[in-house]
C-alpha cells in the first residue's frame, strides 16, 4: 500500500525510470525534483529487498537525472542563464547514475549520446563525460573509505573469452538471428502484458499484490529468479545449469519480469535484460555443444548473447557492446564475434518491425500525460541577443525545446544585405543579431516560448520579462 500511495502521488516513479528520464532529457516531460528523488529511492529499496526480478540501474539513472536538475535549479537562483543548461544537467546526472550503477564510465557517456538523445553533440559529450568521471571518482573514494580499495570492480568478472574458431563462425550467424527473435519476443511480452493489464483496468494495488506474492511463492522453490539477475548470470556462465533448468528459469523469469515491471513498482530492466540474454545464450550454447561445439566456447556464447539481446531490445548496439566489455573486464576479447551477433540481432528485430522497448514505454507515458490535449503547430520569430546561451554556438549544439525545428535564418551578410539561410544540418554558427524562424509542435505554447527565451535572450532580458509577467 505504501508503494501504491506513492505511485498515486508521484506517477513519474513507476517502472524502470529510464524511459521517463529519457523523456525529460529530450524535453518532452518534466521532473518534480524532490518528489521523484525521495519516491524513487524508497520504492526501489522495497523492490530490492522483496527480491523482485528488477534491477537498480533504472532508479540510479532517474535519481542521477533528478540530482542534475536539482543542482541546476540551485544555480538558477544565482544566475538565470543556468536554466538553459537544465537538460544538459539532467543528461549529465543520468549518465553518471548509469556509470556508477555498473562501474562502467564509458557506457554512461555512450548511453547519453546513443540512447538518451539519439544524436552526437559536443555539448552532450562534454557534459556527460565530466559528470561520469566526477561521479566515478566519488564512487571510488567511497569504495576506498569502506573497503580500502580505490580501484574499480567488474560486475561479472570473467577471464578473457575464447575466440570462436573459423570453423564455428556459422554458429554466430544462427545465434544472431535467434537472439534477434528472442529480443523481439521479450519486447512483445512486455508490451502485451501492459496492454492487457490496462485493458482490463487491473487496479495498481492488485497488480502490486500479485507481483509480490508470486515472487515470494516462486522464490521459495527457485531462488535463482530472485533479484535483478547478476548472480544468475555468473552461474549460467559457469555452466552450472542443465538446459532443462535453463529453460525453466527462462520461462519463469520472463513471466515475472513482465508482471513486476508492469505492476507500477520501481525497478530497472537493464540487468534483468542481461539475465534473460544470458539464459537464452546458455540454452543456445547447450544446443551448439550438442552440435559439436567445444565446451570452452560456451561462456563466450553466453556473454555475446547478453550483449546482442540488450542491443536488440533497446536498439542501442554500441551501448550494449561497451557495457558488456566493461562489466565483464573482457575489453577486447570477443569484440569481433560480439559485433557480428549484435548486427544480426539488430537487423532481425528491425525486420520484424518491433519498436525499441524504452521508446514504446515512453510513448505510452506521453500518451497518458497528454490525453485529451490539443497539439498545435506554431511559428516563432526570435531575435538572438548578445550574451545569450545560444550566441556563438552551433545550431546542433543547442538542445532546442522538444518538437522545434529551425525553419529559416534571416541575417546580414558581409556586404550588408539581409539574406535568408538554412541551418546547414546544424553546422551553422548562431550569431547575435540573427533572426531565427522556429516552427514547433507543442501542447503548451507559453511554456515553449519561455524555454526559447532562456536560450536566445540575454539573461537580463529574461529577468525583465519574468518580472513583467509576474506583475
Model-predicted regions and their roles:
Residues 232, 377-381, 435:
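Intrinsic-disorder/low-complexity, polar/charged segments enriched in Ser/Thr/Lys/Arg/Asp/Glu/Gln
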Residues 391-461:
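Cytosolic Rossmann-like ligand/nucleotide-binding regulatory domains
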Residues 357-382, 457-468:
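Long, charged amphipathic helices and adjacent flexible linkers at domain junctions
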Residues 4-370:
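Alpha-helical transmembrane segments and immediately membrane-proximal extracytoplasmic
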Residues 367-372, 385-388, 422, 429:
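Structured cytosolic regulatory/catalytic domains appended to multi-pass membrane proteins
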Residues 316, 374-376, 389, 401, ...:
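Short flexible coil/turn linkers enriched for glycine and charged/polar residues
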Residues 38-45, 379-405:
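Acidic, Ser/Thr-rich low-complexity segments on the non-lumenal side of membrane proteins
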Amino acid at each position: 500500500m505504501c508503494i501504491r500511495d506513492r505511485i498515486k502521488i508521484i506517477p513519474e516513479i513507476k517502472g524502470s525510470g529510464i524511459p521517463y528520464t529519457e523523456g525529460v532529457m529530450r524535453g518532452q516531460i518534466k521532473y518534480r525534483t524532490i518528489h521523484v528523488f525521495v519516491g524513487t529511492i524508497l520504492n526501489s529499496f522495497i523492490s530490492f529487498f522483496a527480491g523482485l526480478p528488477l534491477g537498480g540501474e533504472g532508479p540510479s539513472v532517474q535519481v542521477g537525472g533528478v540530482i542534475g536538475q536539482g543542482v541546476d535549479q540551485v544555480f538558477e537562483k544565482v544566475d538565470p542563464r543556468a536554466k538553459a543548461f537544465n537538460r544538459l544537467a539532467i543528461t549529465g546526472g543520468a549518465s553518471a547514475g548509469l556509470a556508477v550503477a555498473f562501474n562502467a564510465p564509458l557506457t554512461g557517456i555512450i548511453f547519453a549520446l546513443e540512447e538518451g538523445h539519439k544524436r552526437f553533440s559536443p555539448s552532450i559529450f562534454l557534459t556527460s563525460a565530466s559528470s561520469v568521471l566526477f561521479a566515478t571518482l566519488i564512487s571510488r573514494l567511497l569504495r576506498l573509505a569502506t573497503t580500502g580499495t580505490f580501484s574499480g570492480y567488474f560486475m561479472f568478472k570473467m577471464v578473457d573469452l575464447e575466440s570462436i574458431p573459423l570453423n564455428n563462425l556459422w554458429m554466430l550467424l544462427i545465434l544472431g538471428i535467434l537472439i534477434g527473435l528472442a529480443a523481439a519476443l521479450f519486447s512483445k511480452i512486455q508490451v502485451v502484458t501492459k496492454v492487457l493489464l490496462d485493458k482490463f483496468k487491473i487496479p495498481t494495488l492488485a497488480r502490486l499484490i500479485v507481483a509480490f506474492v508470486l515472487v515470494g511463492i516462486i522464490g521459495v522453490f527457485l531462488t535463482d529468479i530472485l533479484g535483478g539477475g547478476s548472480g544468475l548470470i555468473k552461474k549460467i556462465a559457469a555452466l552450472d545449469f542443465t538446459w532443462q533448468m535453463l529453460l525453466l528459469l527462462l520461462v519463469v523469469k520472463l513471466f515475472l519480469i513482465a508482471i513486476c515491471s508492469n505492476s507500477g513498482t520501481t525497478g530497472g530492466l537493464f540487468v534483468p535484460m542481461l539475465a534473460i540474454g544470458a539464459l537464452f545464450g546458455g540454452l543456445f550454447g547447450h544446443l551448439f555443444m550438442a552440435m559439436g561445439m567445444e565446451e570452452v566456447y560456451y561462456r563466450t556464447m553466453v556473454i555475446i548473447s547478453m550483449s546482442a539481446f540488450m542491443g536488440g531490445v533497446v536498439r542501442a548496439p554500441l551501448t550494449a557492446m561497451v557495457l558488456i566489455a566493461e562489466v565483464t573486464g573482457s575489453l577486447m576479447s570477443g569484440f569481433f564475434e560480439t559485433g557480428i551477433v549484435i548486427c544480426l540481432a539488430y537487423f532481425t528485430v528491425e525486420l520484424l518491425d518491433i519498436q525499441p522497448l524504452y521508446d514504446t514505454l515512453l510513448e505510452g507515458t506521453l500518451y497518458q500525460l497528454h490525453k485529451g490535449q490539443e497539439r498545435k503547430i506554431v511559428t516563432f520569430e526570435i531575435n538572438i541577443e548578445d550574451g545569450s546561451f545560444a550566441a556563438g554556438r552551433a545550431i546542433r549544439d543547442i538542445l532546442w525545446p522538444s518538437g522545434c525545428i529551425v525553419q529559416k535564418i534571416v541575417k546580414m551578410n558581409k556586404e550588408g544585405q539581409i539574406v535568408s539561410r538554412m541551418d546547414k544540418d546544424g553546422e551553422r554558427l548562431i550569431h547575435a543579431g540573427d533572426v531565427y524562424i522556429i516552427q514547433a509542435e507543442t501542447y503548451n505554447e507559453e511554456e515553449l516560448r519561455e524555454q526559447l527565451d532562456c536560450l536566445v535572450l540575454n539573461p537580463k532580458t529574461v529577468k525583465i520579462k519574468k518580472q513583467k509577467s509576474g506583475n
